Amino acid sequence: MNGTMDHPDHPDPDSIKMFVGQVPRSWSEKELRELFEQYGAVYEINVLRDRSQNPPQSKGCCFITFYTRKAALEAQNALHNMKVLPGMHHPIQMKPADSEKNNAVEDRKLFVGMVSKKCNENDIRAMFSQFGQIEESRILRGPDGMSRGCAFVTFTTRSMAQMAIKAMHQAQTMEGCSSPIVVKFADTQKDKEQKRMTQQLQQQMQQLNAASMWGNLAGLSSLAPQYLALLQQTASSGNLNSLSGLHPMGGEYATGMTSGLNAMQLQNLAALAAAASAAQNTPSAGSALTTSSSPLSILTSSGSSPSSNNNSAVNPMASLGALQTLAGATAGLNVGSLAGMAALNGGLGSSLSNGTGSTMEALSQAYSGIQQYAAAALPSLYNQSLLSQQGLGAAGSQKEGPEGANLFIYHLPQEFGDQDLLQMFMPFGNVVSAKVFIDKQTNLSKCFGFVSYDNPVSAQAAIQSMNGFQIGMKRLKVQLKRSKNDSKPY
C-alpha cells in the first residue's frame, strides 16, 4: 500500500503532522514508509537532511503525515519510547510537530468564572455558540454534583475563543453571582507548574524567615570566640566613655562619629556578647558585663543561670526585647560609620592612647562578625533598611570580597534574578555583590551565581544555613568560591 490509491489527494482536515526522531541516518523515505504504513496510509514523509554535506546526509529524523488522525495516534502509541530501530541506542521519539501546536486544545480552551449555579452544559453552549463551533463545554462540579459556578468551553479555533473573550468578559453579572462573568484562556500545564513553583518559593522563604527569627537566636552560640572576646574587651575595660576623648582631638569629624555610636549602643553590643557567651555557657560573660535595668541584664540572666543545662541556649522570648534594642544600635552602626571610625583611628594614631586605639579596632572587627546575628534575630526590620543600603550597588555587581568571603551558589530557580539572590543572602551579613549568570545566547539564567560578603564569618554563616536549602524540586548548593589561582571558580 502506498497511501495514494485508496485516498483523496489530501489528508483529512484533522490529520496530524508528526515529528519522528531516533531514526537511522542510513534510512530513506522507502524504509520509513514500510515502517509506518502498517499503522495506516501515509500521505507524506520528509526526511530532514544536512544540506552542508555533499550529497546531503540524513539528520536522523523526519516529518510524517498520515491521511487520518487515527493512524497517526496509533503509530505514536505503538512506537514512541517503545521501539528501538536497528543501529540506534534509544527508542523512537514521535510527537506532533511544532506547527501542530498552533491549534492545540490549550490555545482554544476558555475558563468561564462567575457562572450562575443554575446553568448547565447546554446553557453554556447556547451562550457561547454565537462565536463559533464549540468542541466541548463542561461545568465544574463538586463531589455532591453541584455546580461550582465555573466552566470550561473549547472552540475549534483560537480566533473563535478570542472573539468570545472580547465580547463576553465582564459583560454581564449572572444570577446569584457577586461579580461580572470572567472569560479568559484556561491555564496551561506550564502555567499551573509556574504557579505551584511560586507558591512553594513563597512558603519556603517564609519558613526561612521564621527559622531565622527563632532558631538563630540559639545560633548565637556559633559566634566566633574572638568576636565575643572583642566585645567583652570593649565593655569591660571602661571604654564606654573612651570615645568622648576623640571629640576635642578630632573636631567635627569625631563629633559625627560619636553621635552615631553612643554609650547605649555600646552597651547593647556588649549585651549581644553576653547573650552569645551565655549560650556557650561562658562563666565570665555574666560577671564581666552585668548592668542593671538594661537589655544586658535580661540577656545575661536568661542564659547564665547556675542551674542551666550545659547545652542550653539563650531563651528567644526573654531575649527578644534586648535584641530589638540591639537592632536600633546596629542601625546606627552602618558600614560607613565603621569605616570612618577606622580612618579616624589611623589618622590620629599618634595622639590617641593605646587603650582608645585598641577599643576602636576591637569594636570595628566585632561589628563585622555580629552583623548577621542582628539580621537573623529581626529579619523583617533589618532587611528593609539593609536592602536600601546594599541593593543600590550589590545586585548585579561582580565585586569580590576578601579571601574566604566569596560564595558560589548552584541550583538556583530559573526565574531568580540578581535582586532575588541578594535578598536571600542578606540576612547573613553585608553583601558587596550578588550576581546571577545569564546565557548570552538565550538570555536565560544558567541557574548559578556568586555572592560576596565583606567578611568570611558572614560567608560561613550563609553556607551553614543555605547549603542544602530546598527550593522547588532542587536543593541549593552553597560553597566557597575557589581562589583566583585555581583553574575553576567552583
From Swiss-Prot:
* Role noted for this protein: RNA-binding protein implicated in the regulation of several post-transcriptional events. May be involved in pre-mRNA alternative splicing, mRNA translation activation and stability. Mediates the rapid and sequence-specific cytoplasmic deadenylation of EDEN-containing maternal mRNAs following fertilization. Binds to AU-rich sequences (AREs) of jun mRNA. Binds to the embryonic deadenylation element (EDEN) motif localized in the 3'-UTR of maternal mRNAs. Binds to RNA containing several repeats of the consensus sequence 5'-UGU-3'.
Write out the PTM section of this UniProt entry: Phosphorylated during oocyte maturation and dephosphorylated following egg activation. Dephosphorylation is calcium dependent and correlates with the increase in the activity of EDEN-dependent deadenylation.
| UniProt domain comment | The 2 N-terminal RRMs and a part of the linker region (between RRM2 and RRM3) are necessary for binding to EDEN of mos mRNA.
- Enumerate the UniProt keywords alphabetically: Activator, Cytoplasm, mRNA processing, mRNA splicing, Nucleus, Repeat, RNA-binding
Task: Tell me what this protein is called.
Answer: CUGBP Elav-like family member 1
Q: Which Gene3D superfamilies does its entry note?
A: 3.30.70.330
Q: Name one GO molecular function term.
A: RNA binding
Q: Name one GO cellular component term.
A: cytoplasm
Q: Which Pfam families match?
A: RRM_1
Assembly description:
Oligomer. Oligomerization is required for RNA-binding and EDEN-dependent deadenylation.
Gene that this polypeptide is encoded by: celf1
- What is the organism field in this record? Xenopus tropicalis (Western clawed frog)
